[in-house]
Amino acid sequence: MDDDLDQFFHDDAEQNADFSDDGSEDEAPDNVDVNYELEREEPKSKSVAEFTKFLQECEYPDDIIKYFKTIKFFEKDAKTGDIVSTKSLKFTVTGFIQYLFGTKRIQRPVLRGIAKIFGRYDIFHLISPELVKSITHLKETRTTAWFNLFNFLSFVPHPTDRVTKPLFRQFCVRTPFNDKSMKKRKLTWISTDYDNVWMAVMNGKISDKLTLKLIPYITQNVISKLKAPFKSADFFFKMFDKTDYHGILSLGAIFRLISEHNFEYPKFYDKVYSLTNPSLLYMSQKESILTLLDSFLSSTHLPTYITASFLKRLSRCLLLAPIDAQEPILGLIRNLVIRHPNCSELVHREVPQTLYDDPFDNDETDLHKTRALESSLWEMKLLQCHWNQSVRKRAHFVDKSIQKIESYVRFRCTDELFSVNMAKSFGGEDGEAEKYRKLQDGDEDEEGTGKPEPKKARRKGFGGKFAPKHEEKVTRAVGVNSEAPKGILDRQVPIIDVPTLWKI
C-alpha cells in the first residue's frame, strides 16, 4: 500500500527504487560505497530544544523531510562495529518526545501529518522506549500532553492493519533494520512496540477527560490486536468501578474479557443492572450498549429472577426513553420473553391495578430483592397509547400469543423517524414514503394489533361481464381568457401567411 509520505520524495523516487522493503533490502547498489555514509563526519544538527521549537514552527511535513536530508542518522561503533544511532538521531527522538508532551495542544490534522513520518515502523522502534518512560512519569493533570499522545497513537497503525514503509531507507543505505534477524522478526518487534506503548498508556495516570475517549477507542481498535489482551483487565475493571458513565463505556471490553478470556467479576449482572437507567438511553453509544445487553442476556441458563428484573427495569426506562430508543428496547423486551418462557407470567398477570400496588422495587440494586417476578409488564399497556404508530404496534405483542421466533431489533435515528412521520399525509392515507417503508419492513402483520381490517362489501350486480368497461365521461367547464393578446402576439398577420407566423 502506498504511503502518503511518498509525495515528498519525488526527486529520489527513481534512485530509491532499488531500496524497497523487499528481500533485496540488504543488498547495496552498484558504484555506491556502503561504508561511506557510516564513516563520514557527522554534520552539525539541531539540539533537542532547537528541534522541538522547529517542530512547533513547521507548517508542512516537507520541512521535516528537508531537515532529515541534512543530518546523519547512523554510524559504526568503533569498539563493536555495530551500526548505532548518532547524536543527531537521539536529539531528534528526544525533541519529538518533548514536542508531543509539551504544554501546547496540537491539532489532530497536524498530528496526522506528523504520524506519517514518526509513525513509520523503524523510527517508531526508537521512539517507543522513550515514550514508555515518559508515559510512566506523566501526571494526571497534564491533560494537554495526554490528548497529544492519544491523538498521535491513534494514527500509528498496527502491523495487522498495515505495515508502513521504512523511513531511514529514504536517506541512507545501511541501517540496523537491514540485519537479517531484524527483518525476519519484523512483525514481531513491531507488534511488541505497539503493545508496550498502549499498555503503558493503560497503566498510566490518565486524565479523567481522556478516559471518556480512550475507553471506546481501546475497546474497538486496540484490545483485539494486543498479544495478551488479558493484561488490559486491570485498566477496564478499574474504569468499570469508577463511575456509572465509565462503567457503561467499559461494558464491551469487560464482556470480551469474561467471555473470551474466562475472567470473573463478582456480581457482574448486579453491576450491569445498576447501570441500566434512563440516562443510558440518551447517550450516543446507546445502540452498542443495547446490543451488549442483548448479548449479556442471551444465555437461556440465566436465573429467571435476573431476566425478570431486567425486563422490569427496561420497561420502566421505556417510559422516559427518547423515541429513537423505544423501538429497539421493545424488540429487546419481546425477545427476552421469547428466550425465557418462565417470564411469560409477567405478560399474562392482571395485577397491579395501580402504580403504587406494583411490588417491583425499582430502586433495589440486589437482583434477589427486586420482586420482579411478582409484578407484570403493565408498562406495555401504557405504551399502546403512544403517539407514535410504530411504538403502539410493537407494544401490542403482550395481547397476542408468545411467538417462537425472535424479532429483529431495529435501530433508527431521529432524522429517519422524523422523515417517516413527515411523509404521512395528515388526516388521510399514508404517504408514498410510508407505504414504501412498510413494504421494506415486512413486519406489519407481526407487530399489528391482530385485528384485520374488514373487507369492503361488494355491491351485487357489478363485476364480471356486467362490470362497466369505461368510466362515464364528465364534462367540466374550462376558464377562457377574453382579453386581447399583448406584446409580440399583438400583430396583424393573415392566417394564410404561414411562413410569417413561423418567424414570429
Swiss-Prot record:
Renumbered to this chain, region (Disordered) spans 431-483
Q: Name one GO biological process term.
A: ribosome biogenesis
Q: Where are the transmembrane segments?
A: none
Q: Pfam families per the record?
A: CBF
Gene Ontology, cellular component aspect: Noc4p-Nop14p complex; nucleolus; small-subunit processome
Its family? Belongs to the CBF/MAK21 family.
Give the matching PANTHER family: NUCLEOLAR COMPLEX PROTEIN 4, NUCLEOLAR COMPLEX PROTEIN 4 HOMOLOG
What is the name attached to this protein's record? Uncharacterized protein T20B12.3
The record lists the organism as Caenorhabditis elegans
